[in-house]
From Swiss-Prot:
It comes from Mycoplasma capricolum subsp. capricolum (strain California kid / ATCC 27343 / NCTC 10154). GO terms for biological process: negative regulation of DNA-templated transcription. It holds the Pfam family HrcA. InterPro entries: GAF-like_dom_sf (IPR029016), HrcA (IPR002571), HrcA_C (IPR021153), WH-like_DNA-bd_sf (IPR036388), WH_DNA-bd_sf (IPR036390), WHTH_transcript_rep_HrcA_IDD (IPR023120). Coiled coil: none annotated. The gene is hrcA. One of its GO terms (molecular function) is DNA binding. Negative regulator of class I heat shock genes (grpE-dnaK-dnaJ and groELS operons). Prevents heat-shock induction of these operons. Belongs to the HrcA family. This is Heat-inducible transcription repressor HrcA.
């Protein structure tokens, strides 16, 4: 359990680092704190916070930066909604949107563009129609040539979707195994219940074939995107502008994450907010995966009539969580008002 003084120091470091992207030293903390405290005490408390995993020491400077654990503590225990800021942002957003001009879908898309611009984060909007009565009925493999195969997904409403596979990228035997496992787990399952089976399916795939992640994402994308899944992405350019992604490999991993996550993944991120009785889900650093420790995701699910839409913001771990949280709450409020 952190003391009040440690909480204050952690808050100061998080908020200053978000603003400056520079490690925060004891001298700067002393300037920012509104309590009387010595530099020696700040250094001692910062060392304790580092030892407990809330801060990280930067070897190139005397300052410290927040860790994933530090950001998580800030989001869960320190961050508060500022009513004055919220009101100001609400007026600004309503003026920009001019709600009379747009239907709900256009309002969400335009709002996501605005939020992307305000936060300098990438916005991903996934819309899912009501598919509760549609089932996957059959998966078939058609070998077209020595190097090309087609997988057909047949649905209870008569729809058939086709996905081509280059057999240089995945072996025919692995493809056959994947089809068998998908058929065993998902045939005659309603599409809106597929997520209940995916963890077990993924486990079996991982034991049976090499490229199980690729196959899982490709198959699920084909199944769900074919049933009126709509995806809009705004502000990918902001990935290039954030210094966290100056490293080419980190940038590639971030872009790959945004492009390859299946609709199920996006909804699963937002689902956690409903499970925890919160409107907004926040994932930070290695809570997403080990490769993308510099990334954060903030998501909310908007239920509109018979459809659901997930709005997710993706950016560096060093984002203004308070501002993003307020903007996401505003979108929820605006969409609810629009629908009613």
């Amino acid at each position: 359990m952190l003391t009040k003084r440690q909480v204050k120091i952690l808050q100061t470091i998080v908020e200053e680092f978000i603003k400056t992207n520079q490690p925060v030293g004891s001298k700067r903390i002393l300037e920012l704190l509104d309590i009387k405290i010595s530099s020696a005490t700040i250094r001692n408390e910062s060392a304790i916070l580092e030892h407990e995993g809330y801060l990280e020491k930067q070897h190139t400077s005397s300052g410290r930066t927040p860790s994933t654990k530090g950001y998580r503590y800030y989001v869960d225990n320190i961050m508060k909604l500022d009513s004055a800021d919220y009101t100001r942002l609400k007026i600004y957003l309503n003026q920009l949107l001019d709600l009379r001009k747009y239907d709900i879908d256009k309002t969400i898309n335009y709002a996501s563009e605005i939020i992307s611009e305000l936060t300098k984060m990438t916005a991903v909007v996934i819309k899912k129609q009501n598919i509760k009565n549609i089932k996957l009925k059959k998966i078939e493999l058609i070998l077209l040539s020595e190097f090309l195969a087609s997988v057909l997904f047949i649905f209870s409403d008569g729809d058939v979707q086709n996905k081509m596979f280059n057999l240089k990228d995945i072996s025919l035997s692995d493809l056959k195994i994947a089809i068998k496992l998908f058929s065993d787990f998902l045939v005659d399952v309603k599409l809106d219940e597929i997520d209940q089976y995916l963890n077990d399916l993924k486990h079996q795939l991982s034991l049976s074939i090499k490229q199980y992640d690729y196959v899982l994402n490709t198959f699920i994308n084909t199944i769900l995107e074919s049933k009126n899944e709509q995806k809009e992405t705004h502000g990918m350019r902001y990935m290039l502008e954030n210094p966290e992604f100056n490293d080419t490999n980190k940038l590639k991993n971030a872009v790959k994450l945004v492009e390859q996550l299946s609709p199920f993944d996006w909804f699963n991120i937002a689902y956690e907010s409903n499970k925890n009785m919160n409107k907004i889900a926040i994932k930070i650093g290695n809570e997403i995966d080990q490769i993308n420790d510099d990334i954060s995701m903030i998501a909310t699910e908007l239920k509109i009539g018979n459809s659901s839409t997930v709005l997710t913001l993706v950016g560096p771990k060093r984002v203004d969580y308070n501002q993003v949280n307020q903007l996401m709450n505003l979108i929820i409020e605006i969409i609810n008002a629009k629908e009613n």
